[in-house]
Regions:
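Basic nucleic-acid-binding alpha-helical/helix-turn surface characteristic of O6-alkylguanine DNA
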Residues: 1-116, 162-168
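Short Lys/Arg-enriched helix C-cap and helix-to-coil transition segments
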Residues: 132-139
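…primarily DNA-binding HTH/wHTH and HhH modules…
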Residues: 142-168
Length: 168
């Protein structure tokens, strides 16, 4: 992700929510959701947080609650994320993976038209700033093992189990 200027940071708001996989810290700007962080993180509170940032946080919280209740299979949120061109192509390709399904890192590499870049795809997924919303937990190793996950393999298992139990 690109470094944010002091002015951009001042307009950022955060919210800690409790979910079935533990606490998540949501971070948003006036443009959209910037991060979903595993665990509770106390971030500096700015009096300059815009109403728009607060609105993005509220909407993200609602949609995440719907997801964990099995009532939402796809997120509809404005995102304010940045990475390299390759990272962004990998992150947005995650939206092509259906709820309750998994694909391999090699299959995701083909989705972004870089069939030999499966390791780079895994690395980009590891830097996904909005895990769950852009569902990198749905990407597994070609041999069927879970591979890695920024939130830990126990959380990846829980997310996949949740989606498999709520399919249909």
């Amino acid at each position: 992700m690109k470094a944010r200027t002091k002015q951009q940071t001042a307009m950022t708001g955060s919210k800690i929510i409790t979910t079935p996989i533990g606490k998540l810290t949501l971070v948003a700007s006036s443009k959209g959701l910037q991060q979903v962080i595993f665990g509770a993180r106390k971030l500096p509170i700015s009096p300059d947080v815009s109403a728009k940032a607060k609105s993005h946080l509220k909407l993200a919280e609602r949609q995440l609650r719907e997801y964990f209740a099995g009532k939402r299979k796809k997120f509809s949120l404005n995102l304010d994320i940045s990475g390299t061109e390759f990272q962004e192509s990998v992150w947005y390709a995650l939206n092509k993976i259906s709820y309750g399904k998994t694909i391999s890192y090699a299959q995701q590499a083909k989705l972004v038209r870089k069939p030999k870049a499966f390791r780079a795809v895994g690395s980009a997924n590891g830097k996904n700033p909005v895990a769950i919303v852009l569902p990198c937990h749905r990407v597994v190793a070609s041999n069927g093992t879970l591979g890695g996950y920024g939130g830990g393999l126990a959380i990846k298992r829980k997310l996949l189990a949740l989606e498999n139990s709520k399919k249909g």
